[in-house]
Amino acid sequence: MVGGCCGRKILESRDEGELGYASLESKSEIPGKIMIDHVILTVSDFKRSVAFYAKALKPLGITTFIDYEGKDGHPDLKGFGDGKRYFFWLKEGKPDPQAVHVGFVAKDHSEVDAFYKAALAAGGKSKESPQARLEYYPGYYATWVLDPDGHDIEVVNKS
């Protein structure tokens, strides 16, 4: 498997070297190896966004933070992680919310629901309340919120 989105696996054809889509035959599992190392999201108000994500991501177990002081033209960053690694970063600047969609994995439906409540309480706006989206994938249960800058943030469980 090369990658996947919205319930479809993108497979590499060994014969032709082309990429194609294939249906999933079994229920999704949280992969043992994540192929994306990190995401940096540009936000307009650093303090506001740090406060929002600290509260909104807590139900997902993303509870540790690190400050990175940029040097030689690199921006200051705030990193979020699970205690083992930092993979979600914020930097201050001019955001382009239409250019970004970030999806976080939840271990079950209750984590999806808890994220939604926490995100709204932290100042996020509902895009879609937690619900099954079986047209994406069997067992696809997700919610979508807009962060304070309007970035589209999804939390999904595929069980």
Model-assigned labels for residue ranges:
Residues 74-116:
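Long, continuous compositionally biased terminal/linker segments
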Residues 44-47, 103-148:
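Vicinal oxygen chelate
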Residues 40-85:
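Core segments of cupin and vicinal oxygen chelate
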Residues 28-50, 102, 159:
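N-terminal beta-strand motif that seeds the catalytic metal site of vicinal oxygen chelate
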Residues 5-6:
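Cysteine-centered motifs
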Residues 37, 64, 153-158:
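Long, contiguous binding/interaction regions
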